[in-house]
Amino acid sequence: MCATNFQAYEWGYTYSAPQAVSPVNRIRRVLDYAVTVMPAGKIMMGFSNYAYDWTLPWKQGTAARVLSNAGALELAASRWAEIKYDTTAEAAWFNYTDAAGQKHVVWFEDARSIRARLKLIGEYGLAGLSIWTADRLWRPIYALLESMYSVEKII
């Protein structure tokens, strides 16, 4: 099968203002267009597997720190941070203050946001997905994948 890989992430990135890495509302807009110019069954959706930690107040040109999703959850737990969920972007986030008193915001993927992205594959009839940074795959991704789809090939 020959397919095109659609990178459905990096709206929020190292040098961007704080925001969801992979907002479902924006992914939908791209997919709505993509399926008008090519068969949905030829589209693989690229999937992010990391988080960003931005220092606040954010200043143009400052870099966010990259974390794994598991690392983001560990950080939230260590700081007793309340994990919140943006229902428009379908993304998890939290605020915390570091040991130096500096405020931060972290956007990451949790089981809810992963499920929301995986549902798009079936909803749009896509060929499947590819996962960026699969070498540090967070276990809930596997569990959700196996509960929702039949995995045919892992490369």
Predicted regions and their residues:
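Glycan-binding loop/region signatures in secreted carbohydrate-active enzymes
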Residues: K42-L120, E146-I155
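Active-site-proximal helices and loops of the catalytic beta/alpha 8
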Residues: N5, R136-I155
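Conserved, well-ordered alpha-helix/loop/beta-strand core segments that scaffold catalytic motifs
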Residues: R117-S130
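C-terminal functional modules
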Residues: W132-A134
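Substrate-binding surface in catalytic domains of secreted glycosidases
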Residues: M1-L75
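Soluble non-cytosolic domains of exported or imported proteins
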Residues: P18-R28, F108-R115, R136
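Generic structural signal for well-ordered alpha-helices
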Residues: I27-V35, L118, Y142-Y149
